[in-house]
Amino acid sequence: MAKSKNHTAHNQSAKAHKNGIKKPRRHRHTPTRGMDPKFLRNQRYARKHNVKSGENAGVEE
């Protein structure tokens, strides 16, 4: 008896495009769970010290 076929990609592309291949929805705040703690700590400091130039203009005078 002949061996049976194990795999084929036939019709898979058509099935995927039937409802359209969509990009994942972008959220305003992406979850940080499981991310590198060193990177997250640096992000926190960067966010804390991210000051626009116009906000502290009156302090120097």
Swiss-Prot record:
Keywords: Ribonucleoprotein, Ribosomal protein. Residues 1-61 are annotated as: Disordered. GO terms for cellular component: ribonucleoprotein complex; ribosome. GO terms for biological process: translation. It comes from Arabidopsis thaliana. Residues 15-31 have a biased composition (Basic residues). Pfam families: Ribosomal_L29e. Coiled coil: none annotated. InterPro entries: Ribosomal_eL29 (IPR002673). It comes from the Eukaryota. GO terms for molecular function: structural constituent of ribosome. Belongs to the eukaryotic ribosomal protein eL29 family. This is Large ribosomal subunit protein eL29y.
